[in-house]
């Protein structure tokens, strides 16, 4: 990371990978001066998005091996034909059902709550709070030590209608959220 920022004369490096949630403690330890943002949104909507991505990448990969090979090569195994659950101790094993992805959301964020809450260099970012809240945006800029009054008008994401969600999973994910 230091070589990349040095080479391009940049102060910041952005790594967007859904599986970074698993690595947040490690990343924080090897980059103690870093600022880590952890974006999250309504858990059922986020899980729905992951399921849709999983289905999309499976479909794309049927006709193009490069997609699967490339995603595997760069370590993106959070959906698609190379999918590996973030946590394997699960109740819902059918990757094509929403409950599986909600359970993965719960296991991912539940595991990380203490780490997130006990590190001053980690800031969770709630998508729903970001929409229409200039004050919340300024909090993020302040955390990142960015001196700017620029405001990006974040748009509300389309809500997917949800069917067949395990009520206990739903309750648990919203408690964490």
Where are these regions (language model features)?
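PAPS-dependent sulfotransferases, especially Golgi type II membrane carbohydrate sulfotransferases
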Residues: 51, 58-177
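PAPS-dependent sulfation machinery
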Residues: 1-14, 78-87
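Short catalytic-loop micro-motif centered on adjacent basic/acidic residues
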Residues: 12-16, 124-126
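Conserved phosphate-donor/acceptor-positioning beta-strand/loop module used by diverse small-molecule
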Residues: 16-18, 27-52
């Amino acid at each position: 990371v230091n070589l990349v920022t040095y080479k391009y004369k940049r102060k910041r490096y952005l790594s967007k990978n859904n599986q970074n949630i698993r690595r947040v403690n490690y990343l924080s330890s090897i980059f103690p001066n870093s600022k880590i943002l952890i974006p999250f949104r309504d858990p059922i909507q986020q899980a729905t998005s992951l399921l849709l991505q999983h289905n999309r990448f499976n479909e794309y990969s049927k006709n193009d091996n490069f997609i699967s090979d490339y995603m595997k090569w760069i370590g993106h195994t959070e959906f698609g034909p190379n999918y590996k659950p973030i946590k394997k101790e699960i109740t819902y094993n059918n990757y094509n059902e929403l409950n599986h992805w909600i359970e993965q959301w719960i296991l991912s964020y539940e595991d990380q709550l203490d780490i997130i809450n006990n590190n001053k260099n980690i800031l969770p970012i709630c998508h729903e709070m970001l929409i229409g809240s200039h004050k919340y945006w300024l909090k993020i800029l302040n955390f990142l030590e960015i001196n700017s009054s620029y405001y990006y008008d974040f748009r509300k994401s389309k809500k997917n209608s949800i069917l067949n969600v395990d009520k206990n999973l739903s309750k648990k994910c919203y408690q964490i959220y």
